[in-house]
């Protein structure tokens, strides 16, 4: 089984592909630019890239972060549009679509639903894959890459895999 984990964002959607045995097949981010593209163009770009990832890698399930927006209704509306486009792609390709909240993912994966993002990234680095230090910002002058979106996507896919007991090592 191949699982595609997504941390949805218009500017930088983090993604990863893992097998049910937690073998990492790939990870990256899909970046769009608000100065070059409209909101709808950006949604279209991301949805098409996700569609290609699903088709090329024979993905069985897509798991995305279910986000809550207490403070910014506009961001919530935009991400809801993006989520709708991804759900449409999954339905069109007959691929299972699932959601986990960040708190659920942290609790399932590490046992601590309140663990901060950098703590979850450290857990993933130590137990699964090291894609570099956790960073919310890209600083080209210091060669620091933004890894937060990718680590967040790993938290979602690994937690969903663990929750569904798809990896036999979880059952030991």
Predicted regions and their residues:
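Phosphate- and other anionic-substrate recognition elements at nucleic-acid/protein interfaces
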Residues: 1-172
């Amino acid at each position: 089984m191949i699982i595609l984990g997504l941390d949805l964002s218009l500017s930088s959607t983090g993604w990863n592909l893992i097998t049910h045995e937690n073998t990492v097949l790939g990870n990256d981010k899909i970046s769009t630019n608000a100065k070059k593209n409209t909101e709808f163009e950006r949604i279209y770009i991301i949805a098409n890239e996700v569609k290609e990832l699903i088709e090329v890698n024979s993905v069985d399930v897509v798991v995305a972060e279910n986000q809550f927006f207490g403070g910014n209704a506009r961001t919530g509306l935009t991400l809801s549009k993006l989520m709708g486009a991804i759900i449409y792609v999954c339905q069109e390709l007959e691929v299972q679509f699932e959601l986990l909240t960040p708190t659920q993912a942290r609790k399932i994966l590490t046992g601590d639903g309140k663990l901060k993002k950098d703590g979850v990234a450290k857990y993933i680095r130590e137990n699964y894959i090291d894609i570099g230090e956790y960073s919310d910002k890209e600083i080209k002058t210091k060669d620091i890459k933004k890894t937060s979106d990718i680590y967040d996507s790993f938290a979602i896919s690994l937690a969903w895999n663990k929750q569904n007991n798809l990896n036999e090592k979880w059952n030991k």
